[in-house]
Every structure is written in C-alpha cells, then in structure tokens.
C-alpha cells in the first residue's frame, strides 16, 4: 500500500513539474513573437494549448485518487476566476476590444488555459499533501 502511494506521489510530482514548464515556455515565446511583430504568437499558443490538453488527459487518471472535496474546491476556484475575468472584461474599454478582436480572443484563450493549469496545480498539490499525511500515519 505504501509502495502504491509512493508511486502515485511520484506520478503527481512529475505531472506538476510538467505543468510548470509549458507555462514558462509559452509566456517567453509569445512575448518574443509579439515584440517582433510576427504572427507566430498564435502558433505558440496553439502548441501550448495542445500541451495543456495532453496534461489534462494524463492527469485524469491521477485525479481519480483525489477526493471529490478537492475537486469541488478547484471547481469553485475556477468559477471565481471566471467571474473575476468577466468583471475585468466588462470594465475594459469597448473601442479597444473592437479594434483588436483577434488579439483579445487569443488572450482570452491563453488566460483560460492558465486558469485550468492553476486549478490542476491546486488539485494536485492538495492530493500530494494528503498522500504525505497518509504516508506519515502509516
């Protein structure tokens, strides 16, 4: 039982580390593309979105081991983030939204991906803490 818990802990740690790398790389790459004035920012974003989707699919196995309380907490945090994002969008300047519609869509997609990533990190971290507590008790 302890071996299984350690194995799951190792897998969760690996996923957590892999979640952090695409975020760092996509931010640096899209910043470079924006400063150069090239249209490669959308390609970079698409690549990072694909990476996040791959992490989502591989993470679903690990999330089965996490209690539904943690999942509910992550969902509530996601809903709060979405509400904050809607509030931020509603207070923005409407003329700037009309002038750069494509850029706003890309930014919104990127922020949604980051929100999902942060929620996954929260769920994984709480699962890791529970596993640590379990191993210390056992």
Swiss-Prot record:
It comes from the Eukaryota. One of its GO terms (cellular component) is extracellular region. Residues 56-67 have a biased composition (Acidic residues). Residues 18-52, 88-104 have a biased composition (Polar residues). It is found in: Secreted, Extracellular space. Its main location: secreted. Keywords: Glycoprotein, Secreted, Signal. Expressed in submandibular gland and lacrimal gland. Not detected in other tissues. Glycans are attached at residue 89. Residues 18-120 are annotated as: Disordered. Residues 1-19 form the signal peptide. This is Mucin-like protein 2. It comes from Mus musculus. The gene is Mucl2.
């Amino acid at each position: 039982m302890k071996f299984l818990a350690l194995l799951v802990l190792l897998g969760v740690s690996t996923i957590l580390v892999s979640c952090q790398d695409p975020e760092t790389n996509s931010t640096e790459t899209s910043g470079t593309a924006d400063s150069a004035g090239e249209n490669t920012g959308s390609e970079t974003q698409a690549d990072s979105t694909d990476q996040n989707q791959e992490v989502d699919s591989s993470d679903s196995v690990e999330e089965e081991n996490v209690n539904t309380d943690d999942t509910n907490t992550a969902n509530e945090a996601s809903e709060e983030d979405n509400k904050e994002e809607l509030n931020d969008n509603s207070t923005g300047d409407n003329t700037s939204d009309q002038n750069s519609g494509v850029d706003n869509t890309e930014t919104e997609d990127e922020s949604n991906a980051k929100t999902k990533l942060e929620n996954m990190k929260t769920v994984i971290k709480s699962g890791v803490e529970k596993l640590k507590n379990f191993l210390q008790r056992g």
